[in-house]
Regions:
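Short, low-complexity disordered leader/linker segments with a strong preference
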Residues: 1-30, 56, 88
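Beta-alpha junction/loop-to-helix N-cap segments that form part of ligand/metal-binding clefts
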Residues: 68-130, 224-239, 243-247
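An alpha-beta-alpha
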Residues: 32, 50, 140-187, 289-304
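Extracytoplasmic "Venus flytrap"
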Residues: 31-57, 68-77, 172-174, 226-229, ...
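Hydrophobic alpha-helical segments within soluble ligand-binding/sensing domains
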Residues: 122-164, 263-283
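Pocket-lining segment of extracytoplasmic ligand-binding domains
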Residues: 174-243, 249
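Short beta-strand elements in bilobed, periplasmic/extracellular small-molecule ligand-binding domains
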Residues: 58-79, 138-139, 186-202
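Flexible loop/turn connectors
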Residues: 251-303
Length: 304
């Protein structure tokens, strides 16, 4: 009788232990860092989409996720500080835009903390992925491929007689350099010449606009974080000379650009959130190839 009782007690104890372990696993709370390079609508939409994508997969703020959100305000020094802090405090880091992704990757490399990036235009050029789209490190994410050819067709349809397109770009942003190169390669096919003006900081934009705008028929934006952050300045300068500005995504069109064949950043962020969920569930980020945005969304501002 005692042996049977002992066996029953042991069985119950094992069941309770297993139940407690399962409950502990289910109730695990993750600290996720969201490190955003700059304050503008494209990156804001990425951030919100990322949170939505995680929620779709069952990772909900206040239930099993705590978010730490910081913005570097396009300051490279602050970018490094945020990345290092999150590498220490977070279980996973979502890095928004190329400079922040590179900083987070470097900060998390030794610890092996996963980095999931988004709004990175060329992960291979940024050294975040190999030619197959993967990595030996714990990093993956999503790529905002600018539909350059579609944008050139759009500009031609709006401006049938235009010859020169102006592009402002930040010389330290590898994403902008990659996009500019693609514009230069394809422009001739549509009868355009690209006139580019490089800047170092947002403070350079007014003078760059004053020099560039008289030389061109219009401007087109890249997914350049500094330029997009100063879009109001660019639009003021261009409007004063009657030169249209074409955006690189829908929010820029809402804010005054004439039209765009650009990226839809909420959807891009949602995809990034779903990828982050895979990593939280045990996948090694480097084994997941980065995902590129699909095509572009044409939008037009009838008030411009």
């Amino acid at each position: 009788m005692m042996k049977k009782l002992t066996a029953i007690v042991l069985t119950l104890a094992l069941c309770l232990t297993a139940a407690c372990m399962a409950t502990a696993e289910t109730e695990k709370t993750y600290t996720i860092g969201i490190a955003q390079f700059a304050e503008h609508s494209s990156l804001d939409n990425c951030r919100e989409g990322f949170i939505q994508g995680l929620a779709e997969m069952g990772y909900v703020e206040g239930e099993n996720v705590t978010f730490i959100v910081q913005n570097a305000q396009a300051d490279m020094g602050l970018c490094q500080q945020i990345a290092q802090q999150m590498a220490q405090e977070c279980d996973l880091v979502c890095a928004i835009a190329t400079p922040m992704a590179q900083a987070a990757f470097n900060a998390c490399m030794d610890s092996g903390k996963p980095v999931i990036y988004t709004a990175v235009s060329d992960p291979v050029a940024a050294m975040l992925a190999n030619d197959e789209g993967k990595s030996e490190y714990n990093v993956t994410g999503t790529c905002d491929v600018l539909p350059v050819e579609a944008q050139l067709k759009l500009i031609r349809s709006f401006l049938p007689d235009a010859k020169k397109i102006g592009i402002l770009y930040t010389t330290s942003e590898t994403n902008s350099e990659s996009q500019l190169k693609l514009y230069q390669e394809l422009a001739g096919t549509y009868g355009f010449e690209i006139v580019a003006s490089g800047i170092s900081t947002g403070a350079d934009i007014p003078l760059a606009c004053d020099t560039l705008l008289p030389q061109v028929d219009c401007l087109t934006n890249l997914t350049d974080n500094t330029v997009v952050s100063y879009l109001a300045v660019v639009l003021d300068k261009a409007n004063a000379l009657g030169k249209p500005v074409f955006g690189s995504e829908i929010e820029q069109v809402k804010n005054g650009c004439i039209a765009s064949e650009g990226v839809e950043y909420v959807s891009l962020g949602q995809q990034t959130g779903r990828m982050a969920a895979q990593v939280l569930e045990g996948a090694f980020a480097g084994d997941i190839a980065f995902v590129s945005s699909e095509g572009g969304d044409m939008c037009y501002n009838p008030d411009v």
